[in-house]
Curated annotation (Swiss-Prot):
Region described as Disordered: 168-202
Keyword terms, alphabetized: Flavoprotein, FMN, NAD, Oxidoreductase
NCBIfam families (alphabetical): RutF (TIGR03615)
Protein name: FMN reductase (NADH) RutF 1
InterPro entries: Flavin_Rdtase-like_dom (IPR002563), NADH-dep_flavin_reductase (IPR050268), RutF (IPR019917), Split_barrel_FMN-bd (IPR012349)
Pfam families: Flavin_Reduct
EC number(s) on file: 1.5.1.42
Sequence similarity: Belongs to the non-flavoprotein flavin reductase family. RutF subfamily.
GO BP field: nitrogen utilization; uracil catabolic process
Bias type Low complexity, positions: 171-196
Amino acid sequence: MTDSESAAAVSVDAAAYREAMSRLASAVHLITTDGPGGRAGFTASAVCSVSDAPPTLLVCINRASSAYAALTQNGTLCVNTLGEGHETVASLFGGRTPVDERFAAGTWRRLRSGAPALADALVSFDCRIVGRHAVGSHDVLYCAVEAVAASGEADALLYSERRYRTLPRTPRSGSAPAEPARAPRAVGARPAEGPALALRSA
């Protein structure tokens, strides 16, 4: 048996995998879209940089997500990275809340694509979907970044062990002396119909 055949024969229990993944601390994002396919959005942590030449992000979405059809038809999205104080809006976008109620919880603006950009997000990446790859229940979306807006000054919002936590900002060089280091702190348990593992990929 080759190494590849041996690897393919190993079956990892899905529940054990989800429990292991819950221990990975991840940034929390709202993925939003608007256009011919309608307005939609979901909470995600399965977001990462692919390249800076050209600037490209990767976003994963479950094909069963209520936002999937709109994203597919619109072909654009905005990745809004959240900070402390965004726990409520993150939970709304991660559950079964109606679309209008989700967007009513924030103040929005438009960048280049027309996808809603959260006004007080730590940073918003306005993107055009340029490629996709199906893996299991999800699509991996490759997104060309066409505009960036950084406005928020809050501590970063993380999701780890099924709880929201915050990561204190590090002062930039030349700024005021740093306060003593603080450990990340928990700021709330996962809501009953909140993101769970779906937070990683909605």
